[in-house]
Amino acid sequence: MADTTGRIPLWLIGTVAGIAVIGLVGVFFYGSYSGLGSSL
């Protein structure tokens, strides 16, 4: 990562990463229940 000299707080990065992970998992399960993720 680039050195942001503390401009971006770690809690913000963690929050964004957490939302992204939850979103991807949600889409995966939604696709599975909809039959779109049947290939996995």
UniProtKB/Swiss-Prot annotation:
Coiled coil: none
Pfam families: PsbJ
Superkingdom to which the source organism belongs: Eukaryota
Any one Gene Ontology BP term: photosynthesis
A GO term from the CC aspect: chloroplast thylakoid membrane
Membrane topology: Single-pass membrane protein
Keyword Thylakoid: yes
Cellular compartment(s): Plastid, Chloroplast thylakoid membrane
Keyword vocabulary terms for this entry: Chloroplast, Membrane, Photosynthesis, Photosystem II, Plastid, Reaction center, Thylakoid, Transmembrane, Transmembrane helix
Transmembrane segments: 8-28
HAMAP family hit by this protein: PSII_PsbJ (MF_01305)
Assembly: PSII is composed of 1 copy each of membrane proteins PsbA, PsbB, PsbC, PsbD, PsbE, PsbF, PsbH, PsbI, PsbJ, PsbK, PsbL, PsbM, PsbT, PsbX, PsbY, PsbZ, Psb30/Ycf12, at least 3 peripheral proteins of the oxygen-evolving complex and a large number of cofactors. It forms dimeric complexes.
Task performed by this protein: One of the components of the core complex of photosystem II (PSII). PSII is a light-driven water:plastoquinone oxidoreductase that uses light energy to abstract electrons from H(2)O, generating O(2) and a proton gradient subsequently used for ATP formation. It consists of a core antenna complex that captures photons, and an electron transfer chain that converts photonic excitation into a charge separation.
Family: Belongs to the PsbJ family.
PANTHER family: PHOTOSYSTEM II REACTION CENTER PROTEIN J
Protein name: Photosystem II reaction center protein J
